[in-house]
Amino acid sequence: MKWGLLGGTFDPIHMGHLRCAEEIREIFDLNRIIFIPASHPPHKLDAAVTSFYHREQMVRLAIEGNPSFSFSDVENLRAGKSYSIETVEYFLNKYLKSIEIYFILGQDAFQAIQTWKDWQKLLLLCNFSVLTRPGYESMGLSGILPEEFARQFIYDEAADGYRGPSGHLIYFRQVTFLDISSSDIRARVKNGKSITYLTPDSVRHYIKKNKLYSTE
């Protein structure tokens, strides 16, 4: 079984998240994409984040009806900050060797990977699928990771990815870039502007019903 793990704040989830997930599912023929909202994002400690409950409900509504998409609240079950290394280890320990993990993240996040907890260990635990935008020129791993560490990953032409000493690969894959952001959606709601077609209707209705992001 091949599972993709897609973490994020999802405040709120939007069409960009969903489209990227669908394209990566198709590219790697994944059996499942698991959406994992961060409970306490370590890189956003100073920012106000909507309650986990509301973000969970919005994700559940957004993926409803897609049998390949599922939800996990694993990061809300742990106390303290939400670290990706702990989430990946949770799935590996729970399902042992019955799943192959593809950790999904954007190119901007990957370029900041050295700020993550136990990032070197994380890169050896599972496959990484780095989402790139049209026109993005891959600088290779040496332009992102320390040279000595990057040398452990050898480009595998057949897989079109960088294979590490653990056998897992780091892939760079171009996906459709929808210029949508959660922060823009929040700002639009606050200013009374339409968010139709930026997020699923079910999420839009939930935001309105619960007066999220609004000053009312």
UniProtKB/Swiss-Prot annotation:
List the GO biological process terms. Answer: NAD biosynthetic process
| The EC number(s) this enzyme carries | 2.7.7.18
Q: What class of enzyme is it?
A: transferase
Picking any one GO molecular function of the record gives: nicotinate-nucleotide adenylyltransferase activity
| SUPFAM superfamilies associated with the record | Nucleotidylyl transferase
Which Pfam families does this entry report, sorted A to Z?
CTP_transf_like (PF01467)
Q: Keywords in UniProt for this one?
A: ATP-binding, NAD, Nucleotide-binding, Nucleotidyltransferase, Pyridine nucleotide biosynthesis, Transferase
* Function of the protein: Catalyzes the reversible adenylation of nicotinate mononucleotide (NaMN) to nicotinic acid adenine dinucleotide (NaAD).
- The name this protein carries in UniProt is Probable nicotinate-nucleotide adenylyltransferase
